[in-house]
Swiss-Prot record:
Protein known as: L-ribulose-5-phosphate 4-epimerase UlaF
Record keywords: Carbohydrate metabolism, Isomerase, Metal-binding, Zinc
Keyword Transport annotated: no
Cofactor note: Binds 1 zinc ion per subunit.
């Protein structure tokens, strides 16, 4: 697990590097599907002092199997998403300013241009709010459930992020670094959408044919963007 712990540590350290977190906010995890184990950031540990060996290993029930710290308070959310979506290899939660701003607004981040379409096939959805019973019960688990309720049976790697109402963004990917990459993009397109709609409040969504072209040339079966 040492290699995965190092990857998760590096991905967590990318959060302050890319300006996605303040203080100890945010967390990144990754899963070893063969062993059924998840590596995740420890709860409340400062990035400045954190080391790879501080990463916490939990099983799919959330039981700590390796590590001296408690795992992230959002661990149950991560585990619920891993259980539901086998294609996920890494998950990240941040409170990055612009993506988080859409959470109290209760709005999806609209697909307005090709930067968005290069990564997200359509709007980045916003979940419904959790009920008082859901919050007072297994809050973090129910956060995962409301994300799944919103995504449904859609391929999560086609929409690799979501805004949880009144909370903030979650993003995911094939591994921990891919998840952070998508979180960075999510922050940028959230900012772009806010600026664009400020300039032109009547701005329409990106044309569907342009959306399809940009997403499929990077992620479709005949993708040709980048090098092989």
């Amino acid at each position: 697990m040492q290699k995965l712990k190092q990857q998760v540590f590096e991905a967590n350290m990318d959060l302050p590097r890319y300006g996605l977190v303040t203080f100890t906010w945010g967390n990144v995890s990754a899963i070893d599907r063969e062993r059924g184990l998840v590596v995740i950031k420890p709860s409340g540990v400062a990035y400045e002092t954190m080391k790879a060996d501080d990463m916490v290993v939990v099983d799919m029930s959330g039981k700590v199997v390796e590590g001296k710290y408690r795992p992230s308070s959002d661990t149950a959310t991560h585990l619920e998403l891993y259980r539901r979506y086998p294609s996920l290899g890494g998950i990240v939660h941040t409170h990055s300013t612009h993506a988080t701003a859409w959470a109290p607004a209760g709005l999806a981040i609209p697909a307005l241009g090709t930067t968005h379409a290069d990564y997200f096939f359509g709007d980045i959805p916003c979940t419904r709010g959790l009920s008082e019973e859901e919050v007072q019960g297994e809050y973090e688990l129910n956060t995962g459930k409301v994300i799944i309720e919103t995504l449904g049976d859609a391929e999560p790697l086609h929409t690799p992020g979501i805004v949880v109402y009144q909370h903030g963004p979650f993003a995911w990917g094939k591994d921990a670094h891919d998840a952070v990459h998508n979180a960075v993009v999510m922050e940028e397109v959230a900012k772009m959408a806010w600026i664009a709609r400020s300039i032109n409040p009547q701005l329409n969504h990106i044309d569907s044919f342009l959306m399809n072209k940009h997403f499929m040339r990077k992620h479709g079966p005949n993708a040709y963007y980048g090098q092989k």
